[in-house]
Amino acid sequence: MDRVLLSSQLSSQTVVNTRVQQGSGGINSIGFAVIRKGSLKLRCYAIGGLGGGENLNDPLKESNNGPVLQGFNGSSASFRTVGAKITQETGDFFVSDAEGDPDKPTDGFSSIDEAIGALHEGKFVIAVDDESGDNEGDLVMAATLADPESIAFMIRNGSGIISVGMKEEDLTRLMIPMMSPIAEIEDISAAASTVTVDARVGISTGVSAADRAKTIFTLASPDSKPTDLRRPGHIFPLKYRNGGVLKRAGHTEASVDLVALAGLRPVSVLSTVINPVDGSMAGMPVLKQMALEHDIPIVSIADLIRYRRKREKLVELIAVSRLPTKWGLFRAYCYQSKLDGTEHIAVAKGDIGDGEDVLVRVHSECLTGDILGSARCDCGNQLDLAMQLIDKAGRGVLVYLRGHEGRGIGLGQKLRAYNLQDDGHDTVQANVELGLAVDSREYGIGAQILRDMGVRTMRLMTNNPAKFVGLKGYGLAVVGRVPVISPITKENQRYLETKRTKMGHVYGSDLPGNVPEEFLNPDDIAGDQDEDDTHN
């Protein structure tokens, strides 16, 4: 049986209770709660690998990397991880208001319909990619309605860089190539930049508001030809990814989607809003002040995703079958993406019913780990453990997303990255050395599959916080996180540690709610009652 080491310097009114279990099939789990004054402050679970053996390091090691829980000095523990903290979750990782009205805007934001109306009239909209304001906000307008005055406003209040969101067919027609020489491998998390352009006629240097408006008009016109543009220039076209915000929750996609919803030609103008005081990207206070002063609707990209998701469906269920597996009996669902034709599979156990509190794993394709049993990663072990846990729970869904090989770089590039790792690079450095994205996966298709299968709230099996964010806006809520901790081997030890230190992977699970009985003992309860009586 596994043990947990808690060497803590906690206040006398803080109680840490633990529970250790060894389940069938070699699945081990540990749970513990932190209780202050009878109130649950944190409840964590860690789930072990698929049995012991020589391939495991010592099940528990004292960590030199700090406390078990953030803010608790002197605590140290590791549950089959490489000196890893069991990291406390924050509210930022939880998606609330799962159902509600998809057309109802987030508090403090304008509705999508208001934004659509403003764009149709040639006015501005501010699009924000995170309701907390941690990320940027962009001024957006329709390219077909841009004029020198509006471009001058964008220059005064933005970064000075004026971009134009365009669909691939228009970029191809105008022979505008991508800026990156590796056009076939794109970082979906970043804007897809092309070479810069100016209009060939009707401008002077190309830098004035009037000149830039002329270039934008040329880009937006369906009658323009490649010879109408010169390269480089002062306008920055950005390639819109097919599927828009349902494929990538970025400003380019949001701006083009909004303009198209306004019934206009799908070409947008956008520029990042800058804080006039220090030149940094404007946060929510600055963005909302600008919106108030200039009567500009301000919208959340998450709201736009909800708006589109209510009206569109980008996956199609094409087959369902009974699927007996080594883990148990499941149902297999094959979904085809309407964006690129890729077939994805989901397996389900039990009755999803009302879709509440479903155990879910969204798993990225890894041929080397899942099929060939590669020891370089933990993918195969995580898949195995997730299927076991769903079978044991009797109810759950695993979505297997194709096209995620090597965190989105593809099989061949992943093998090249392996060679670099053998030469001393870690998994992040290897991708960077190849000129590739560290992680270009997106989870919108997986979210739509879950919605179609009836899932509404879930306990998500993951160590990766990006999956929480990737589900936002699809009418799904994450009510808890179940970590998927797999055996450490000599081959994957550095890989797992790099994911923790450089990619933000976390361990442990913060589940809000009342204190469960299994974490309490009579002394705790009596002490709490005595304290309450004193205050009464």
From Swiss-Prot:
<comment type="similarity">
    <text>In the N-terminal section; belongs to the DHBP synthase family.</text>
</comment>
<feature type="active site" description="Nucleophile; for GTP cyclohydrolase activity">
    <location>
        <position position="441"/>
    </location>
</feature>
<dbReference type="InterPro" id="IPR017945">
    <property type="entry name" value="DHBP_synth_RibB-like_a/b_dom"/>
</dbReference>
<keyword id="KW-0934">Plastid</keyword>
<feature type="region of interest" description="GTP cyclohydrolase II">
    <location>
        <begin position="311"/>
        <end position="536"/>
    </location>
</feature>
<keyword id="KW-0479">Metal-binding</keyword>
<dbReference type="GO" id="GO:0003935">
    <property type="term" value="F:GTP cyclohydrolase II activity"/>
</dbReference>
<dbReference type="GO" id="GO:0005525">
    <property type="term" value="F:GTP binding"/>
</dbReference>
<dbReference type="Pfam" id="PF00925">
    <property type="entry name" value="GTP_cyclohydro2"/>
</dbReference>
<feature type="transit peptide" description="Chloroplast">
    <location>
        <begin position="1"/>
        <end position="43"/>
    </location>
</feature>
<feature type="binding site">
    <location>
        <position position="366"/>
    </location>
    <ligand>
        <name>Zn(2+)</name>
    </ligand>
</feature>
<comment type="pathway">
    <text>Cofactor biosynthesis; riboflavin biosynthesis; 5-amino-6-(D-ribitylamino)uracil from GTP: step 1/4.</text>
</comment>
<feature type="compositionally biased region" description="Acidic residues">
    <location>
        <begin position="525"/>
        <end position="536"/>
    </location>
</feature>
<feature type="binding site">
    <location>
        <begin position="248"/>
        <end position="252"/>
    </location>
    <ligand>
        <name>D-ribulose 5-phosphate</name>
    </ligand>
</feature>
<dbReference type="InterPro" id="IPR000422">
    <property type="entry name" value="DHBP_synthase_RibB"/>
</dbReference>
<dbReference type="InterPro" id="IPR032677">
    <property type="entry name" value="GTP_cyclohydro_II"/>
</dbReference>
<feature type="binding site">
    <location>
        <position position="427"/>
    </location>
    <ligand>
        <name>GTP</name>
    </ligand>
</feature>
<feature type="binding site">
    <location>
        <begin position="133"/>
        <end position="134"/>
    </location>
    <ligand>
        <name>D-ribulose 5-phosphate</name>
    </ligand>
</feature>
<dbReference type="GO" id="GO:0009507">
    <property type="term" value="C:chloroplast"/>
</dbReference>
<feature type="binding site">
    <location>
        <position position="377"/>
    </location>
    <ligand>
        <name>Zn(2+)</name>
    </ligand>
</feature>
<feature type="binding site">
    <location>
        <position position="467"/>
    </location>
    <ligand>
        <name>GTP</name>
    </ligand>
</feature>
<keyword id="KW-0809">Transit peptide</keyword>
<feature type="binding site">
    <location>
        <position position="462"/>
    </location>
    <ligand>
        <name>GTP</name>
    </ligand>
</feature>
<feature type="binding site">
    <location>
        <position position="138"/>
    </location>
    <ligand>
        <name>D-ribulose 5-phosphate</name>
    </ligand>
</feature>
<feature type="binding site">
    <location>
        <begin position="405"/>
        <end position="407"/>
    </location>
    <ligand>
        <name>GTP</name>
    </ligand>
</feature>
<feature type="binding site">
    <location>
        <position position="379"/>
    </location>
    <ligand>
        <name>Zn(2+)</name>
    </ligand>
</feature>
<dbReference type="GO" id="GO:0005829">
    <property type="term" value="C:cytosol"/>
</dbReference>
<dbReference type="GO" id="GO:0046872">
    <property type="term" value="F:metal ion binding"/>
</dbReference>
<keyword id="KW-0378">Hydrolase</keyword>
<dbReference type="InterPro" id="IPR000926">
    <property type="entry name" value="RibA"/>
</dbReference>
<feature type="binding site">
    <location>
        <position position="382"/>
    </location>
    <ligand>
        <name>GTP</name>
    </ligand>
</feature>
<feature type="region of interest" description="Disordered">
    <location>
        <begin position="507"/>
        <end position="536"/>
    </location>
</feature>
<dbReference type="InterPro" id="IPR016299">
    <property type="entry name" value="Riboflavin_synth_RibBA"/>
</dbReference>
<dbReference type="Pfam" id="PF00926">
    <property type="entry name" value="DHBP_synthase"/>
</dbReference>
<keyword id="KW-0547">Nucleotide-binding</keyword>
<feature type="active site" description="Proton acceptor; for GTP cyclohydrolase activity">
    <location>
        <position position="439"/>
    </location>
</feature>
<dbReference type="InterPro" id="IPR036144">
    <property type="entry name" value="RibA-like_sf"/>
</dbReference>
<dbReference type="GO" id="GO:0009231">
    <property type="term" value="P:riboflavin biosynthetic process"/>
</dbReference>
<feature type="region of interest" description="Inactive DHBP synthase">
    <location>
        <begin position="44"/>
        <end position="310"/>
    </location>
</feature>
<comment type="function">
    <text>Involved in riboflavin biosynthesis. Catalyzes the conversion of GTP to 2,5-diamino-6-ribosylamino-4(3H)-pyrimidinone 5'-phosphate (DARP), formate and pyrophosphate.</text>
</comment>
<protein>
    <recommendedName>
        <fullName>Probable monofunctional riboflavin biosynthesis protein RIBA 3, chloroplastic</fullName>
        <ecNumber>3.5.4.25</ecNumber>
    </recommendedName>
</protein>
<feature type="binding site">
    <location>
        <begin position="361"/>
        <end position="365"/>
    </location>
    <ligand>
        <name>GTP</name>
    </ligand>
</feature>
